[in-house]
Design a protein with these regions (language model features):
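Core catalytic alpha/beta fold that binds nucleotide/phospho-ligands
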Residues: 1-191
Length: 191
């Protein structure tokens, strides 16, 4: 199976009706905590992908790894990584561990650029999503590694993507699978 990517971008705030409709995709333990549009869209992407790829009608019960990485204990062959940022969400799905991160390009401090050896803001965010996707694939807390390098893993590959103008993303895998062309959806299509 190739790595499947799903992405959504919203250029406007969601209406209350849209929020309510998207909230039905949230796992029960997150329904009281998640109120912003980006994570709502991320879980809607996950539900859609699970239905399209595996025929699952409902979101399986989530379990969480030592550092909070979500997984489906009832479906150990389904691996996914959710990411969201200002106005966008990204999902990667595969049959092996996968990590994905998306960020909106925005200004960062000179100190942060220096720390990551980044020439400019866009370069910083490209390096950042690569680091985050590697951590997410491995199930490692990026916060715990704040001042250290992310360990390397055999056969690790990181793909750089520009899913939307002014956004950058990274997808990490240790498999030899290719990435399918991302499936871009609108909020209306998710509802």
């Amino acid at each position: 199976m190739n790595i499947r990517l799903y992405a959504v971008k919203s250029d406007r705030p969601l209406s209350e009706a849209e929020r309510s409709t998207l909230a039905r995709f949230l796992p029960p333990e997150r329904q009281d905590r998640i109120k912003t549009s980006e994570p709502l869209c991320a879980y809607a992407l996950l539900c859609r992908a699970l239905h399209e790829l595996y025929g699952l009608e409902d979101l399986p019960q989530l379990s969480y790894g030592e550092h909070g990485k979500p997984y489906f204990a009832s479906h150990p062959d389904v691996h996914f990584s959710l990411s969201h940022t200002r106005g966008a969400a990204l999902l990667a799905v595969h049959n092996e561990p996968i990590g994905a991160d998306i960020e909106c390009l925005r200004p960062v401090s000179g100190a942060m650029r220096t720390r990551f050896h980044a020439a400019n803001d866009a370069d910083f965010w490209r390096l950042w999503v690569q680091r985050e996707s590697r951590c997410k694939r491995a199930g490692i807390s990026a916060v715990a590694l704040r001042d250290r390098e992310v360990p390397s893993f055999p056969n690790e590959r990181v793909f750089a993507l520009e899913p939307f103008p002014d956004y950058t993303a990274g997808v990490c895998t240790c498999s030899d699978a290719d990435i399918d062309k991302p499936i871009y959806l609108t909020v209306k299509e998710l509802i």
